[in-house]
Every structure is written in C-alpha cells, then in structure tokens.
C-alpha cells in the first residue's frame, strides 16, 4: 500500500477506498463487486478497464501476481479465463494460453481455489470467462456453489 492515507467516500450504498493506486469498491447494500464497480464508474462519468488473463498460464502463482499487478496498474475488473481443451471461439493467443495452462495442470477446481486465495489479498471484481463444457463437467450446482 502507498504512503497515502486511505480516503473513504461513499453514498451510503458502497464504500470506496482510494489508496492512491487503485480505487477499491465494496458493497454495503448487497450489490456485488461487479455492480458496485460499474455504479462507481457511472457516477464518476469515467470509463472502466477490464483486463483479461488466462488463469494458470503459466502457473497459479504467476496468475495471482499478474492479477495484483493489473489491479495496481488501474484495472477496474479482471476476467480470469478458464482454460478449455477446445477453445474454438477464442483467437490464437488465448488458445495458446489455454493449452499452456492445461499442460501445466490448470483445472476449474484449481482456478476456483486461486480465486479464494486472491480474495484474501484483493477485493477487485473478478469474473470467470469460460465455456459451458468445463462447468458442465464440474457439475453445474457444484460450480455455482464453489464459485
């Protein structure tokens, strides 16, 4: 954290903490982090940056480090791509990242564990971007419960 004091503002529905590096938005009225971030951006009249990374490429540890670096660099939300063995809707860069992640042992369960560990270090909104197939294989109810 920077030497700047944490300045807290809000409208009674959320708490925005400005550390000088990133504005952390957490909900106080049941809104999720994603809704709260977009609400904050609308009120400020600003644009948001949604960064993307394929989870597990090249490792879970590297993914966590990159997520935290993207947050420090100003990302408002971060999409974590869940690698899939047949990523036909993705371009070649994401296809190759998915293949590397899978070759390194990335799994949906491992990625959900990564998200839980990241939650201990950051409150930035995280979105999982995936194909239906890995979720179906994991089990729809189990995936929803674990996510």
Question: What name fits each language-model region?
Answer:
Residues 2-4, 11, 27-50:
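N-terminal amphipathic alpha-helix/helix-capping segment at the start of soluble metabolic enzymes
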Residues 30-35, 86-92, 106-114, 135-141:
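Active-site-adjacent beta->alpha loops and helix N-cap segments on the catalytic face
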Residues 44-49, 74-76, 122-126:
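Short, well-ordered coil/turn segments that N-cap beta-strands
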Residues 49-62, 127-140:
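Active-site mouth loops of central-metabolism enzymes
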Residues 51, 81, 147:
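Conserved, mostly hydrophobic/aromatic
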Residues 57-60, 77-107, 134:
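Glycine-rich, proline-tolerant flexible connector loops at the mouths of alpha/beta enzymes
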Residues 68-71, 144:
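Non-catalytic positions within long, well-ordered alpha-helices that form the structural scaffold/packing
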Residues 93-127:
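Alpha-helix-loop-beta-strand connector modules within alpha/beta enzyme cores
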């Amino acid at each position: 954290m920077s030497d700047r004091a944490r300045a807290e503002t809000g409208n009674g529905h959320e708490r925005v903490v400005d550390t000088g590096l990133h504005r952390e938005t957490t909900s106080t009225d049941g809104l999720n982090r994603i809704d709260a971030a977009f609400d904050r951006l609308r009120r400020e009249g600003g644009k948001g940056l949604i960064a993307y990374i394929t989870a597990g490429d090249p490792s879970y540890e590297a993914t966590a480090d990159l997520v935290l670096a993207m947050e420090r660099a100003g990302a408002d939300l971060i999409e974590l791509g869940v690698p899939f063995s047949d990523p036909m809707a993705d371009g070649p860069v994401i296809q190759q990242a998915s293949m590397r992640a899978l070759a390194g042992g990335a799994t949906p369960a491992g990625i959900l564990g990564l998200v839980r560990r990241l939650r201990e270090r950051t409150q930035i909104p995280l979105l999982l971007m995936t194909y239906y197939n890995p979720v179906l294989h994991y089990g729809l109810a189990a995936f929803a419960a674990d996510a």
